[in-house]
């Protein structure tokens, strides 16, 4: 395809914005068609109660892969980031707590109040993740190799990665091979004896998934996240103005590179002729001829809603149908008239003050059994009566999100299945919100009386309002059989599809985890290579 030909992208989520940016830099003419009135996908800021705004779905940034951040230069487009320290505050119902700082030695000092042994082990664990980071990080940036006929580039990438792994030594190589299939609960138990410490770290392996800490392969998910950020508890980066400001800056960077963006442009159908895409048709009937189409939406929506399934090979269609994408995460936003008090946050623990201690993420899930019980309910079609929560109070870093002196509390809620066994989400939405408030009140007893308003976003909402089939925040389950060369399906994990010049760039492609931009950048590289 000659340089300068039109490539049309479906959806304006973060990965699509990254893909379009690099396509423009590569000399193509990308056009993004976004069905909503603004871009951002799951990384947007919206008013959920009069005067109160929140990052509706995602509430922290990836972190964005460092090379992408350097290329897009988001700070030039008024993207201002905050990186709170400590990153995580983890209370227990009994009034104890841990704080996780950037400084591992300082964190270890707090852990020593629970276990002197674990204080030393925490340093060892952090060093282990830091040791693995360069190797695991490489995997985020490569295209999964072709299984049947790997290209010279595939072999070179595997050689580089293999050489790095070999450099770790036989013991560490054995550790990696053993750890990947393990349950996160077993993995953390090899290092720690303190239940709260185990739970906070194991939670990285289950966040956003339909798995509990005793599920096989959750250590692989934990290590996948460590490949993006080697800190034991992960990232806690926020954008001033909410994540909508982050994706707005991405859109401005893409426009500056030559990307055209149209909002309120819902794609109804992908046109195909003789096995190749020819363009798109919008819901209003408007047609867009295209030499190539890149879908930033999930595979099931792409192949079963935007394409005629009869154009697909039956084996491929069955694999896509079997791609697990039913989510178990909900989101609850609270409009508060004051900052809640957490009794576990004592002067002895919060040496830098309560505001700093609460400015990162707040982990609600005091032990492994608690996390597993929260997961159990979803296996049988119910939501957790005592859910695992990943909480932020973004107004501590950005007071503009609420009226003066008031606050926003935002909570990811697990586990809440897409399909309920009894009732429906419209009927049980309030019950889920009440459950979250009751759970939070265990740790912050004054919170219920501070609430002015509440918004509950269910997995069903993620499908109907945001277009995530099955309500999965990562477009598909992060399980061992749906990672790397099998994401989304075997034989088609290289961002291409069986339809010529139709590509995928969303979170259902490798590596498919959080706001790192990696799926989008990898897809752009393969698209440029295929079209030149």
Task: Mark where each language-model region is.
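A conserved FAD-binding loop/helix module that cradles the flavin
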Residues: 507-528
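A conserved short coil-to-beta-strand element within the FAD-binding core of flavoproteins
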Residues: 263-277
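A glycine-rich dinucleotide-binding beta-alpha-beta segment and adjacent secondary-structure elements
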Residues: 194, 198-214, 365, 381-394, ...
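N-terminal glycine-rich phosphate/pyrophosphate-binding loop and immediately adjacent elements
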Residues: 2-148
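Glycine-rich loop(s) and the adjacent beta-strand/alpha-helix scaffold that form part
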Residues: 236-249, 253-257, 270-271, 281-346
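FAD cofactor-binding and catalytic pocket of flavoenzymes
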Residues: 74-78, 306-410, 461, 467-488, ...
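Flavin-binding catalytic cores
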Residues: 313, 339-340, 376-385, 425-464
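Active-site/ligand-binding neighborhood in enzyme catalytic cores
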Residues: 130-257, 468-483
